[in-house]
């Protein structure tokens, strides 16, 4: 299985930190957010990765290179300007191949065994989404779970972690495109499975949340 890490966003709410670095390179617990993902994916047996980039993307490429220093192979998908989630996936489809692939937001942090993600069967679904308890900054939630399927009713928050069939995006035109409208189309057809994440999830969307997680990880390491 291949995995795609989304790393093209500007990170406006993280300025001024993201004036100098792309958000996935911001460090928590002594290493960049994106490196936490890469190491956990490798531990789960996923060694072929696709990473998209736009804002300060050259710094991601300079830092991670071809991935060999981390024991993985990285294929880069450069975007002239950020294409949103679905647009980024559509552009990267030739790099992702014909098998189901995992997608993870590069500006999140997960404390769980990534094998639970990699070993998830898709069955007849076009997508499988991992949901999380609603964080304080998003109390309403996004979607709900109903008999193993995700439905368009606010209850839990979409973690950004998903498993997808390439066919779900095949034939869609190139260009900027959000993922949520596609997900809702598939949900209406009963084609989106889901479950709750079996571990901790953090959306690192502000400087304060980055600092809070970094301090927490440093305390754990003592």
Predicted regions and their residues:
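Active-site metal-binding loops of divalent metal-dependent hydrolases
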Residues: 10, 106-108
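Catalytic-core segments of class I nucleotidyltransferases/pyrophosphorylases
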Residues: 46, 102, 109, 115-122, ...
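N-terminal nucleotide-binding beta1-loop-alpha1 segment
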Residues: 1-19, 42
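Short beta-strand-to-loop element that shapes/binds the nucleotide-sugar donor at the catalytic cleft/hinge
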Residues: 55, 128-142
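Conserved beta-strand segments of alpha/beta enzyme cores
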Residues: 24, 73-75, 126, 191-193
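Short catalytic helix/loop segments, enriched in acidic residues and glycine
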Residues: 20-35
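Conserved N-terminal catalytic core of the sugar/cofactor nucleotidyltransferase
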Residues: 2-5, 31-105, 145, 171-174, ...
